[in-house]
Amino acid sequence: MYLGLDIGRQYVKMVTAEKTKTGYKVIDAGCRLVPEQNATYDPEKIDHSHWVMAVKELFRQQGFNPRKAKGLITGINGSSASIKQITTMEMPSDELESAMTFEARKHIPMDGTDAVIDYQILGSNKKEVDKIDVGLVACTKGVLNNHIDLLKECGLKPGIVDVNPIAMSNAFSFAKDIPDDGLVVMLDIGAVSSTLVVYGKGEQFFTRDLPIGGHHFVKELSEKKEIGYIEAQDLLFKDGLSASKSDSASDSMNEVGIAERTVYDNLIEDMRRSLRFYAKQTGQSFFLKIFLTGGAAGTPGLSEVVKDKLNIECAVFDPFDSMDGADDVSISNPSQYTTALGLGIRGGMDLG
């Protein structure tokens, strides 16, 4: 049994899964709020002690003893790591490692500690002879040590440390067939940021962190309606994007003038820019569908607005769809477990 543990800014999520002859079977899934219940969420006030308490409470809530797991797999957020697909000359392995370390330093925010890298040769480059494509993942020792210290504070024995964007894509690849042509886009909407992932068969893997998350959805609604954070959160969960619509005559008059940009407009514009950048860099722009994951993915009306504004099919992704054992797991928001499931699957890939 593999334990995928996703330690988010607002929720910690866990998925336990077993490897079977045909794939994986989900055993359990659960989540726990990191801040205090019924308190205004302030991401700046969340520290190690909150995460430690939330992880321990989550295990207690699920009646789970982490020592029973064959392996613990956790992830580092995309904003704290760099994931790049590099095209380089073929070279001996020791030279390639030096080249990748040099490359990593250009892409990760250095904090005075050394870079930690992992890379995999993906194959020959389709366009340039004598060149290879290499998948590079990097973070700093400071980031990695901070993550491992947190796990130890939770009483856990650190195992495999993955990066969340790759965990997302592993969960998707397990649940869906990747088309031979075209690109899949995933948007994981976290509390304070979102992670965009673009990939396809034989195509360049791309990820970008966007500085907008579910917390900003709630905050904007709270300010616009002049209501408390918790009330705004409940209203958003119930009514979705329609909750932001003006309901007074004065607001209606203001709408005749310059339309006010919303947090959703900003998020979609960030997505548009990222997809344009990908198309410009790769020459590929056949985006088949956008899949929304994460805690705020199911916000009513969001997938429809993304589809209308970007003119690309959009849907909320359910990582447990048609998965063995899913019917026996009681959860209310499947999409928020995408990363945790992907982490568990990584355990089966490496430890199975």
Give names to the regions the model predicted:
Residues 1-103, 145-147, 155-157:
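Non-catalytic, solvent-exposed interaction/assembly segments
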Residues 1-33, 70-77, 175-206, 210-216, ...:
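Gly/Thr-rich phosphate-binding beta-strand-loop-beta motif of the actin/hexokinase/Hsp70
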Residues 36-43, 142-170, 203-245:
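Glycine-rich phosphate-binding loop plus the immediately following alpha-helix
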Residues 75-175, 289, 319-323:
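Active-site neighborhood for divalent-cation/phosphate handling
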Residues 224, 235-288, 296:
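Adenine-nucleotide phosphate-binding core of ATP-dependent small-molecule kinases
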Residues 285-315:
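Glycine-rich phosphate-binding loops at beta-strand->alpha-helix junctions
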Residues 297, 315-352:
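Glycine-rich phosphate-binding/hydrolytic loop that grips phosphoryl groups
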